[in-house]
Amino acid sequence: MGSVNGPLRVGIGGPVGAGKTTLTAELARAMGQAYSVAVITNDIYTSEDAEFLLRAQVLPAERIRGVETGGCPHTAIREDASINLAAIAEFRTRLPDLDVIFIESGGDNLAATFSPELADLTIYVIDTAAGQDIPRKKGPGLTRSDLLIVNKVDLAPHVGVDVAQLEADTRAARGRRAYVMGSLREGRGVPEIVQFIKEVGGL
């Protein structure tokens, strides 16, 4: 298909271990049949996330690109997004029919946000196992992203987290912004996330 305005660019952020790469893989699987999809992963010194996606065979190799950011990972998605913008330009040249590019940030803290120049839509992932108080910390990634994913809710009983209270705190932190309570490895929440991307992203 491909839009005259270029592909929808979806930024995926969140702390290390929250489930960003799992989300990227699930979205590529879920949307790769109906849409022309590509993925850019950001890692500090390796291309480990890109290699994981290649091994999982979620997309053909020519649709996955790993960039090594060096230093602080949020710089490559915010202050100086040139390395990611160059990867997008390369994809658009090679795959002119692209509908969606998922841009996965390197693991960072709750303050990381995407430059509007880089991402049209932002998704932020947090980990239930990181503790009951995460939504109350209200970092910009958590409060300002277009969609928040509270991942690994299946682990709540094992880490002493009350899911009802976690959701109440999430709702309070988000205001009117959307969120999904999910368990991405089990596919829980993925259909809702795909629907959100289609509706809000105009696919």
Swiss-Prot record:
Assembly mode: Homodimer. UreD, UreF and UreG form a complex that acts as a GTP-hydrolysis-dependent molecular chaperone, activating the urease apoprotein by helping to assemble the nickel containing metallocenter of UreC. The UreE protein probably delivers the nickel.
Keyword Chaperone (UniProt) = yes
Binding of GTP: at which residues? Answer: 14-21
User: Its gene?
Assistant: ureG
Name this protein carries in UniProt? Urease accessory protein UreG
* GO-annotated molecular function: GTP binding; GTPase activity; nickel cation binding
- InterPro entries per the UniProt record, alphabetical: CobW/HypB/UreG_nucleotide-bd, P-loop_NTPase, UreG
What SUPFAM superfamilies does this protein's entry cite?
A: P-loop containing nucleoside triphosphate hydrolases
Question: What compartments host this protein?
Answer: Cytoplasm
Gene Ontology terms, cellular component aspect?
Answer: cytoplasm
One BP term from GO: urea catabolic process
Q: Which family does it belong to?
A: Belongs to the SIMIBI class G3E GTPase family. UreG subfamily.
Q: Name the principal localization, coarsely classed.
A: cytoplasm
User: Keyword annotations for this protein?
Assistant: Chaperone, Cytoplasm, GTP-binding, Nickel insertion, Nucleotide-binding
- Top-rank taxon of the source lineage equals Bacteria
Q: What does this protein do?
A: Facilitates the functional incorporation of the urease nickel metallocenter. This process requires GTP hydrolysis, probably effectuated by UreG.
